[in-house]
Amino acid sequence: MPTVEELRTQGEIGGRTVQIIASGDVRCTSYEPAPLAEGSVRIATVRSAISPGTEMTFYGSNASNVYLHKRWNEELRLFEEAAPSMQYPITFGYRAAGVVVDPGTTDVPTGLRVYGNWRHTEFTAMPAERALAQALAEDLSWDDGVDIGQMGPICVNAVAFGNGEHRGGIAVVFGAGPVGLVTAQVARADGADVHVIDRIPERLAIAEGLGFSTLLADGSDTAATLKRQMGANGISVAWECSGSTFALHEAIRIVRRQGLVVAVGFYQGESRGLLLGDEFHHNGVRLVCGQIGNLHQSMTWESLRARTIELARNRSVVLGDLPRLTFSVEDAAGAFEALSRPAAVLQTALDFGK
């Protein structure tokens, strides 16, 4: 993984930049932007958003992200017990939108609005052709752009792993966080009758506001409840978006015999509550990972973003208008801390004052 200095010299970070340090705390520091490479433009970030899943696994004194504890062998594509792949300080982020402030030697117009998946940093460099390809339409908000960069594609990719089996039928999404809420909307736009399950009433209220039927995971048997309503064969596909292995087990229980479960969440540590000798074994349930690092065979990054933009512009999917609590980039520590209160805060955004 690149060091902070390598990121700076490559033009990926500059100016006010958010870091997670060795104690697990968050700070905002500043770096002198590197000179622009030939053919690149400089973008000033207007807004970025913190991932309440992946980024939070690097945060805090008990950070659990596997890259902090094992080494990723790219050739073999497996983790090994060796010096970890990532070390603090970590400069992360992958949901951002901004404006071109220096076109360099290119023909890209100054002031062009751009979306992307760069880090929480004030300035970033981008090849001109990519900036033009990722221009943010004027009818979309900055927060829409932030979510077109990566959040929307995450969810479009996840729904693609349903392989169309959800169309015209009943599907379930576990987790009413940002990923779950957008996945549910994409699945509905793709023809599914979607039900959303979560343990937090405040998040289910957001799902209901988007028009979804919901079920509170209150410790009762949610799978049995829905199967009694829908029938044993009523639910073909479930998406697990919470990152809880207990929820993954319930997703396996809730689908029909030989049904499909798409695991979208980032599961940490050992899989507590996941009993593979139960319904997974006896019902022949198919379990597939729908994580964005592994694109569905029908998709490319370009098609994922194009579909996200289409859904956002025709208002089939609410992106930027989903609730988010905004902090100045200087108070990034407060933005991370707020995500430890999931009943009150769905997601947080950083404002760069541009």
Predicted features along the sequence, with ranges:
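C-terminal hydrophobic helical "lid"/dimerization subdomain
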Residues: 1-13, 252, 302-354
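Glycine-rich beta-strand-centered segment in the early N-terminal region that forms part
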Residues: 34-49, 61-118
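Residue-level marker of beta-strand positions
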Residues: 47, 112-114, 123, 170, ...
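Short, well-ordered coil/turn residues at beta-beta hairpins
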Residues: 117, 239-241, 352
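A structural motif shared across PLP-dependent enzymes of the aminotransferase-like
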Residues: 117-130
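Mid-domain Rossmann-like dinucleotide-binding core that forms the NAD(H)/NADP(H) cofactor-binding site
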Residues: 142-220
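Glycine-rich cofactor phosphate-binding loops and adjacent beta1-alpha1 units
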Residues: 163-167, 205, 213-288
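C-terminal substrate-binding/catalytic core of Rossmann-like NAD(P)-dependent dehydrogenases/reductases
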Residues: 224-228, 232, 273-323, 334
